[in-house]
């Protein structure tokens, strides 16, 4: 019985230590999420305005153009956005599963550019090759990081090595809801886009388009990185809160078992003492 008490006591101590860690990590994730949401909200106005401008710009492009009509390549690029660290619930698995599900439809003509350590690990285990890997993205992504990724992807597109650029990321909706999105950013989706003549271009738009597309793609990547980081921290906060709750439930159960065994041991000792005293009469 004493051995059983010692074992339970050790488990209680171990789970208590684990709870301290999960609680601390949950608090850190909450703080980091607050910053991530602030950055996302600050960028939203610029991103939305730029999206509207790009629709007008793309509608004003004259004749055949690779950014509106495609470049003839069958290869599709998928840029997947995962985290560098773990312990964030199903965040990484959901992104990779969505990417793999889409890629499996035409694996022969699909290429992967992985953002985040976890994505790289997932694809390696699933035996999917990647053409580029970007890791150690900051919790507060920078335009420089977005530019590095977007320039690489755009270079491949301009050279005709890929015919589509798709981003697979987790869109932040709220602390408890994030949606996995697969968005094609190039070539532009011209459906329902018509030139309304509200913008005049000087010089002609076809002379400006390559530079505009570079800025547009960087803006897209930056927005997706911000969404991804906010989603990551929300998932981590939820996972750590759940782990802390589970630890509390385990501790309640173990403490109850410990007290029952201890009470039983004390009762047995009292019974033995009383029995011994009775025997001596």
Swiss-Prot record:
Domain of life: Bacteria
GO biological process annotation, one example: proton motive force-driven plasma membrane ATP synthesis
PROSITE patterns: ATPASE_GAMMA
Keyword DNA damage: no
GO molecular function, one term: ATP binding
Membrane-topology annotation of the record: Peripheral membrane protein
Family that this chain belongs to: Belongs to the ATPase gamma chain family.
Function: Produces ATP from ADP in the presence of a proton gradient across the membrane. The gamma chain is believed to be important in regulating ATPase activity and the flow of protons through the CF(0) complex.
Subunit composition and interactions: F-type ATPases have 2 components, CF(1) - the catalytic core - and CF(0) - the membrane proton channel. CF(1) has five subunits: alpha(3), beta(3), gamma(1), delta(1), epsilon(1). CF(0) has three main subunits: a, b and c.
HAMAP family: ATP_synth_gamma_bact
Protein's name according to its UniProt entry: ATP synthase gamma chain
Native source species: Clostridium pasteurianum
